């Protein structure tokens, strides 16, 4: 049916009549005009595409607008742009120019002409053949020390806050580019919450967990860099540091510190503010918003506020990397410890243990079964026995040994000495005054030594022992006519002689002159005497140096209050330590003074 109709003379006549109608004639003319306009705009767009892509987008928008305004077109225009009778070619050019201007504004180009008239197109085309003027760049901020921030962020950065304010570590340090060198800018920083949650640290999993909702908001604070305002050139040629910024949890703070809540997560922000837009900038007000304000933040700078570090890894990392935390580092890496310092001075410490009256009970009690007492009282209140002097473990070298001697010249009747397994190591007889002396030593402070009048030391050594004899006529203190004290020096095979033949030379002497006395140590090569140590209580003398004789004495002092000689005597054939003549006594009462004891610390060190 349709074919019949189409082939009918009526239908053919209607089509021919329509081709010569007024509407068809007007539409063809308009179509020709639009094609001319499109060719012209296409040429402009081709030239504008070299310099700015926004022009082509603007031209497309103008054509679209003109096609939308074309309502009376009889035939559909090809590829989308026909103009209606209500719009002229000038309007199309104006619309195209306006779209191109929008494109420049979007591209931040200063070359867009505000009028959008046809005369503006040649002006733009004249500017396009040359190099276009540089458009101002958008500000760019780069975080300095980003690697350190990332290390903290991987663990979970924590920042200490205190009432007085605490600086951040790592501190925010940035580098800014893209500013107008001649424009003035403010650089500021604020810290905003990441979310509205409160956190707690779970130690067994070493993670931060949500503990509830955030606390009430704190007063806003902004830290304005002290160098603000400054030109863009000044800001761009330096690293901008916010190391003086402090964090506090004191909501009543009036020092300008940033107020934060503990156990919350925060994000620092850096603001670049043009001076003309920073009139409302204040440390106690939020940062103003506007066209001249740019904010920058970095995800690795998120931190959790704490009053004490929760994660030990954060603590160690901050101690290692913070230059202000040197005091918390291991001192052994930087300086010698006290113990190492003391060890470098061997003479400060005794090389062997001190032999005291308290050590004597460690000597085993051997010998006759009838040996039950050491010292017998003399009726003056001294205890009859001192069993603690003879008991305990085996002998050690060096040590004092007690044993009987068949040639005793002075007995402590009826005391028996227990024999020691070692031969030649004997302490042959104290006089009965030894009990009094020992009792006097064990008494409280306030006791004084009663200096004997004529005791003397005579030491004669064998190949294995050094015998120090104490002789005299007075029995007050350490006095026996021919009592010998045998002490072994370990490994000392050569002879060691300490001779004081003069009867006037004494150990604890009054102000006596010693005439004709010959005092000497004789030490045969290759052995050497390291030193003796007679340990006394610090109360024995106000100054240990006073105990030492001014010339020729072999006694020294140590920091512990011990009278000791820690110097190695060279292995020479003869060493004169106590010279003849003068007042060279072993212990002189003029230097010793009134001696008081609180403990029985009279001992000897032998090496």
UniProtKB/Swiss-Prot annotation:
Quick check: keyword Chloroplast in the entry?
A: no
Q: Residue spans with biased composition (Low complexity)?
A: 44-53
Specify the domain of life of the species encoding this protein: Eukaryota
Query: Changing residue 524 to Y: what effect?
Result: In CAKUT2; results in decreased transcriptional repression through a dominant negative effect; does not affect nuclear localization; no effect on DNA binding; no effect on interaction with SIX1; no effect on interaction with TLE3
**Major location category of this protein:** nucleus
Q: Which SUPFAM superfamilies match?
A: p53-like transcription factors (SSF49417)
- Which part of the chain engages DNA, per the record? 143-330
Is-annotated flag, keyword DNA-binding? Answer: yes
Motif placement: Engrailed homology 1 repressor: 18-28
Per the entry, what this protein does is: Acts as a transcriptional repressor involved in developmental processes of a variety of tissues and organs, including the heart and coronary vessels, the ureter and the vertebral column. Required for embryonic development of the sino atrial node (SAN) head area.
Q: Identify this protein by name.
A: T-box transcription factor TBX18
Annotated organism of origin: Homo sapiens
Query: What's the encoding gene here?
Result: TBX18
